[in-house]
Amino acid sequence: MQRITITIDDDLLETIDKISEQRGYASRSETLRDLVRDAVTREQAAVDSETKCYATLTYVYEHETRDLSRRLTTTQHHHHDLSVSTLHVHVDGHDCLEVSVLKGTVGEIKSFADSVVTQRGVRFGNLHLIPSEHGPHDHGPHSHD
C-alpha cells in the first residue's frame, strides 16, 4: 500500500469527515479509499462495454400505466440471460418498486437498463454497476457451509 499526500479545501474536507462519521469509518484514509475505489469502479465500467459485471437496476413504476407491466415483463424475458433475480414490491395503490440483480457485460446491462427506464410510466431508475475482474461465476462452484 502506498501513502500519498493531497491538498483539499476546507469545505470538501468537512464533507469527507461527515461521510466518515455517518458511515462509521475509523479514519479519513478508509473513507477516501472507498470513495476513490467507487469512482474508479464507475469510470472503468463506463469505459469498456465488454467488461464483465454484476449490477442492480432499481426503478419505480406506475402499474396502472397502459400495458406497462406487460411491456416490462416482455423486456425482462427478452433479456433473461442477464437476470439473476428480481424483487417486486407494491409501494402503494399506484406504484411498484423493482430491484433486478443482473450479470453480463456492461454494454448488455446498460442496454437492458435503458430499455426499462425509458418506458413511459417508469420513474426513479438507477443502475449500479460492479465490474468483475473475473466473469460472473468464473471461479467455479462454491459453498456457504
Curated annotation (Swiss-Prot):
Pfam families named among the record's database cross-references: NikR_C, RHH_1
Binding positions for Ni(2+) per the UniProt entry: 77, 88, 90, 96
Matching InterPro entries: Acetolactate_synth/TF_NikR_C, ACT-like_dom_sf, Arc_rbn_hlx_hlx, CopG, CopG/NikR_regulator, Ni_resp_reg_NikR, Nickel_NikR_proteobac, Ribbon_hlx_hlx
Example GO molecular function: nickel cation binding
CDD domains, sorted: RHH_NikR_HicB-like (cd22231)
Cofactor entry: Ni(2+)
GO biological process, one term: response to nickel cation
SUPFAM superfamilies: ACT-like, Ribbon-helix-helix
Keyword annotations from UniProtKB, A to Z: DNA-binding, Metal-binding, Nickel, Transcription, Transcription regulation
Cofactor note: Binds 1 nickel ion per subunit.
Physiological role: Transcriptional regulator.
Family note: Belongs to the transcriptional regulatory CopG/NikR family.
Name recorded for this polypeptide: Putative nickel-responsive regulator
